């Protein structure tokens, strides 16, 4: 399905190495890009408009890391400019981009979004709970 829309597929054959390995695979594959937008697949209420707003904020401030947030709580999607790729490539274990953001708080720009859009759903029970509260 991804190919139908012009997207490539990158498979992580070592998920046991943690989130950092997934980030490194994507970063290596897109190393020639000016920035990378990282997203997770378990935010069912994330709106396409939010992704567009995060991208627009990065276009306005391309030297900044841009992340969706609600009341100061950061989440995904998040865009990292190329200059941060080396730091993303050396993350280990289940460490994500937050480790890079913590080292560069002055370079972070957030886009305020509804809390529900940042909801991370990892289990059927979590999905049922989220649907219950909608």
For each of these PLM feature ranges, what is it?
Residues 90-134:
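Conserved alpha/beta core of the MobA/IspD/sugar-nucleotide pyrophosphorylase nucleotidyltransferase superfamily
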Residues 75-86, 124:
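Conserved nucleotide-sugar donor-binding
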Residues 45, 79, 120-121:
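Short aromatic/basic micro-patch
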Residues 20-23, 51, 85, 94-98, ...:
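A general structural signal for well-ordered alpha-helical segments in protein cores
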Residues 1-74, 104-114:
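Nucleotide and nucleotide-moiety/phosphate-recognizing core
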Residues 44-45, 84-86, 116-117:
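Short histidine/acidic/glycine/proline-rich micro-motifs that form metal-
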Residues 9, 87, 120:
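Conserved beta-strand positions that form and line the central face of beta-propeller blades
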Residues 73-75, 80, 96, 116:
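A conserved catalytic-core signature of glycosyltransferases
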């Amino acid at each position: 399905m991804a190919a139908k829309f012009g997207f490539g597929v990158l498979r992580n054959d070592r998920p046991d190495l943690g989130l950092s390995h997934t980030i490194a695979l994507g970063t290596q594959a897109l190393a020639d890009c000016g920035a990378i937008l990282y997203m997770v697949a378990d935010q069912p209420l994330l709106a396409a408009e939010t992704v567009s707003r995060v991208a627009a904020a990065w276009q306005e401030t391309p030297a900044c890391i841009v992340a969706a947030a609600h009341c100061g709580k950061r989440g995904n999607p998040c865009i990292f400019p190329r200059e941060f790729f080396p730091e993303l490539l050396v993350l280990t274990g289940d460490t994500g981009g937050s480790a890079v953001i913590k080292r560069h708080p002055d370079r972070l720009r957030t886009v305020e979004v509804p809390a529900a859009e940042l909801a991370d759903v990892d289990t059927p029970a979590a999905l049922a709970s989220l649907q219950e509260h909608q």
